[in-house]
Structure formats: C-alpha cells, structure tokens
Amino acid sequence: MNDFKLTLLRKWEFDNEFSFVYASILLPDGTAVILTSDYTDWHKYYALVLSTEGVKKIPIEYNPTSNRDYPVLFRYKEGFGIIILAKEVWYYSDIYSSPALIPIKNKTLLRYNIVPEKAQQRYFQNISDSQIIPVCFENEVYYGNARCFALLEFDDTAKTAKWKSFSKIDKKAFTHHDDRWADTPKIDSLKILDKRIYAFIPGESASSVNKWGMDYYALAQISAEGKVIEKIIESDNLHTDHKKHGVNGCFTDSEYVILTPVFKSDEWKGNQKVFSLTTREYGNIFLPKGMTKHKLQNITGNLCLTSLFDRGLKEISLCNYSNS
C-alpha cells in the first residue's frame, strides 16, 4: 500500500476549552462530529459538530452512575447518535435537528438483563455499516479500560433500540495470552463491516501500560460471542526485553485502521501508520507542513480528520489524502 499524503482543507481552532478527542465520525459532506469533554472538568461531555458554518457545541447532560460511565458516539446513515448509560439513544437525524430520545430495551425473553446493570460504557471509537452498533464496556473491574462488548440493534425509522448480546473476547486464541490471570483481552476499538465484527486488542495485562508497556497487541475478526475467527495482526510477546512497547488501534469510516504507537522509542519512532483491512498492508502518514504534531483521528472517502492536543484541544483539521 502506498503512503498517505495529507493536504489541509479546513481547520477549526480552540482555546484549550476541551480535552481529548475521545471518538469521531465523518459525514459524507465533510461535516465532522467529535466526542470530547471540558478540559477542567472531564465529566462534562460535549459533541462538537464541525462544518463550514463553524462549531456547534452540544452539551451531553445526564446523571452518570459513576465517573467512568461515559457517553458513546456513533454514526448512523446521515446522522449520529449518542448512547447514554446503556439505557437511551439520543439520535440526531442531521446536524440541525433536535435529538429523538429512544429508550433501549435490555431484556431477554426470560426477562434477564443482556447488559449487566453495573456494566459501564466506554467511549472508544466504534464503526458500523449496519443497524448493529458495537459498543465497548467494562464490567466487574473498573479501571477505565474495556474488556467487554455489546451489540446494539438500532432503527431510527421505527425509533427502537435493543441490546442483542454482551460478551468478552476469548483470550486463548492469542499466542501470548497469560493463563495465570483471569483478565480477558482489552478492547481499543470495534467495527462492523459486511456483517463481520472486528476488534483491536491492546493486550490483556492489568499493569500500567505507560510504566511497563503492553504484553501484546492484535487485530482480529470475532463473533458476537467473542470467539476469535481470524487473527489479522498479532504482535510478538512485547515483554521479552527491557524496552517498553505498545500500539493502539482505532477503526475508521473506511477500510483503514489507524495504528498509534504508545512510545516514541519504538521502531516506528512514535509515528502513526494506517493498515488496510482490504489489502492487509501498512502505510505511512505524511502530514501537511506545520501539522507534524497532529494525530489522525478518522478517515472516510478521500477525507480524513486530525487533531492537535497541547494542554487542551488546540485544533481539528479536515484534510484530503492521496495514496496513489
């Protein structure tokens, strides 16, 4: 695969009011929506709609059951939705509309909860080309990671939403899993494409990644029950030397997965790469002049979204790219 060369189209600037880009979507007309939070109060969440008309700030106001029960952003048709507490979807059919408030059903035929009552949503990026939306969760142990996932069936026309399944990923499929602990694989990002479910897995160790590095990472196709169908990427054991290693993965509104190394000391020297689910090849990313500190966030068609964080969110940029 050829390298990605980005050209700047549009830029939105911020004055450190917001924190990180937790998740993003790109609509076909180049409108972007990002999930972020207040820089000084990370429990105040916002959806920022970025278009040619400027920035529209949508406060996401609800009463969380804990400080880590995050809202979840997803793209659906020409609009977007926000999942609140695994109980309700706020669906915006377009960027100008008020949201439709759609309750989520969470019972089996035997009246059992599908998503456990104490499970907590994680805002990690999810992508889907269907009515089934994959969502990251944590359950039983709460460190801000995601070790579970659920599938939400959503229909904006019928205004219905219901949980279909709640699962963990089978660790035994991975070469470097650790049987000494019950920890299941962590999940960075989820994607559904052509009825296939994909997950990026940043290892399973509960130890601090910043302090010790990852134990392994992988990109896999999985079933709704968490069975590993295919390992597309699987790293070596990353704890075999005294260096720290690790790569995070983020699915996009395209065939590409954004790979971000955790440490600048690794073989990628801290530079992001893209990986194609179609060709199974890697590509380098070349940012426009003056934007070398930006991070790629999403890709759709020939458009991509980048962000700059420097003691707060400084810039969001819309670019096009060529890889011919």
What is each residue range found by the language model?
Residues 1-18:
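A short helix->beta-strand "capping" segment at the edge of beta-propeller domains
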Residues 7-12, 56-62, 110-116, 162-170, ...:
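Beta-propeller fold detector
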Residues 13-38:
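Beta-strand-rich domains and repeat architectures in extracellular enzymes and scaffolds
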Residues 18-25, 65-76, 116-137, 175-192, ...:
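Repeated scaffold domains used in trafficking and secretory/extracellular systems
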Residues 30-34, 79-83, 131-133, 141, ...:
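Entry beta-strands of beta-propeller and related beta-repeat scaffolds
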Residues 38-42, 88-91, 141-142, 148, ...:
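Short glycine/acidic-enriched loop and turn motifs that connect beta-strands
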Residues 46-50, 96-105, 149-153, 213-224, ...:
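Beta-propeller blade signature
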Residues 295-324:
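Blade-level signature of beta-propeller repeat domains, shared across WD40, Kelch, NHL, RCC1
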